[in-house]
Amino acid sequence: TLDIPGKELSGILTATYFLRMVVLSDSGKLDESETLLHDGDNVVVIGAGNVAMDAARTAIRRGAENVTIVYHKTEAEISSFPSEYEAAVKEGVQFNFLKQPIAYLNKKQMRALNNIRRKPAESDETDLAGLLVQNITKTDDGQFVTEGGQEVIPCDCVILAIGQRPAARIVSTTKGIQVDDRGFVITRERPYGMTTRAGVFSSGDVVHGPATVVLAMKESKKVAA
């Protein structure tokens, strides 16, 4: 999660949760409304990895009016595969680089910023309506500094695709399986996919980090071969 003011507002969800809800909806196991995305929504995705691209493209296909990826670094520094980035651009995803989220805004706060007056509603203080971001500049020596003021991005939904780490449950309860400093399972090239515990194999996001479903399936088949 992103620990900034407003994180308790309705309309903020993780990319993994959103994508799982979409899969369940597509399989008929969940009502479409429970994906927490509605036709015409303005969606902001925070992060620029493969999962972020997947979530952004999925949101467009689910009927979102506008989908914007917000990233705190430059275009050249996005962590997704180039092909995933290019596909997102083709599908209409917009990109807002060098922006650092600093607060989620509710409807009441957005109305105050826009100087709009109307009868208060119960959802005014509980529903997400915007994201406040700090503009960032990259200096000649590669440092990122906060300058250039702040901006507000109106949105009905924010999808978080940052800071994802594998769940430690299996590793912490199974002796002999080592992970790297990021929490990902260490595997060997020969035999391919075997962990540091003999006879135990691993593949997918828990090894190489969040990526695409296609890559996870490809790696799993390779390990099983």
Stretches with model-predicted labels:
Residues V206-A225:
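A conserved FAD-binding loop/helix module that cradles the flavin
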Residues L13, Q94-N96, L132, F201:
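General small-molecule cofactor/ligand-binding pocket signal
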Residues G28-A64:
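Rossmann-like NAD(P)H-binding beta-loop-alpha module
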Residues E8-G40, R111-A112, K119-A121, E125, ...:
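FAD-site-proximal beta/loop scaffold in flavoenzymes
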Residues A56-A103, A121:
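Rossmann-like dinucleotide-binding cores of NAD(P)H-dependent redox enzymes
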Residues T1-I4:
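Small-residue-rich anion-binding loops in enzyme active sites
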Residues L98-M110, E122-T126, I136:
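A conserved short coil-to-beta-strand element within the FAD-binding core of flavoproteins
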